[in-house]
Amino acid sequence: MMLQVYSAANLLWILCNSAVINFCQFVLWLLVRPLDGALYRRLMGSLVQALWVDVAATCFPDAKLVVTGEVPKDTARPVIIIANHQVDADWWYIWQGNIKIVLKDQLKYVPIIGWGMRLFEFLFLRRSIDHDSAHIKAYMDSLIGDDYPFWLVIFPEGTTIHQEYVAKSQAFAEKLNRPKFERVLLPRTSGLQIILDAVADVKPDIYDLTLAFPTYSGEVPTFEMGYSRKIDTSVPSMKSLLAGQGPPHVAIHAKKYSYDAATQNLEQFLDARWQEKEERLNYFIAHQKFPVQKDEDVSVLTLPSSIFSVFKLWFGMTMSFFLLPVVMMSFFPLYTVWVVYCFVYSVYDRTTNFWWPYIFNLFLERAGKTRDGLASKK
């Protein structure tokens, strides 16, 4: 009972603070985005999204990230991250300020949390090639056009691992003569292929992440078990994190690949990477760590969590309550004066170079031509 109360309190805490985040997002969307879309994106990522991560972390148990391999260091360069998808909480250990995550379209309709992810410009897909192709192209063109250093996370497996999905994955792989796996699901290529085609102009680096949790033994849950495990109880879920239960550390292995290496034959590339994941996870089961080569780095990172971030969030909202009305009360009178001026100017001077009177005059001219045309027909 106490655990349920604690979980409910944590969820309420996250929702309340997320609602405040929504307000801050709305303020930026209203005041900054119309003036400078690129600045809006950078503020939303480096300030608001990073703050949301910090605030949410106050509810979850502390965890260290033991990162082996090639750790991304150039934060100004676009990156595409591919990863295995063990459970519904693994994205939490990847999420940072400028990261965009590819998610199911239905999630954007979740109240408060979904609204926030939508304003953070996560990439929502319907799993419809016709819709997703055009949507991804427009989405990536917009990020590239603003020179935004996005880190886009995609889980090519498309869903979390369960025994029923493993059986379907293996049957599908056998039909296509592709490798069959036990620890991971066969990766899908269509969504990632569209994304790679859309970012061909910038050729981002590709980072392959493999995640594993302490005491992981390879247990795969059934649909009935959901995200819980009977043996690998240290594998977290969002439910367990809300209850304050989570692993003390998470193992992440990162390996960097060039854009050209991935695009030459994406299916073969993903099959090779997932075969490596299978072997890497088997090694982890035996040794409780990932293998490290001599030229690879080992870094221990701590997830940010500070009650001061909550103070910053609420202070920012309080200031916004005072500043937003002032800005709006200043904006609308000035806008009204400008519209009246443009109207008067357009009436007495038809040679103006101002854009608003020009459009107004153009509208009057076309209306006059239409009226004259109708009169001549009569």
Task: Write out the residue ranges for each language-model feature.
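Membrane-anchoring hydrophobic helices of lipid-metabolizing enzymes
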Residues: M1-V79, Y93
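Soluble catalytic domains of membrane acyltransferases
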Residues: C59-D232
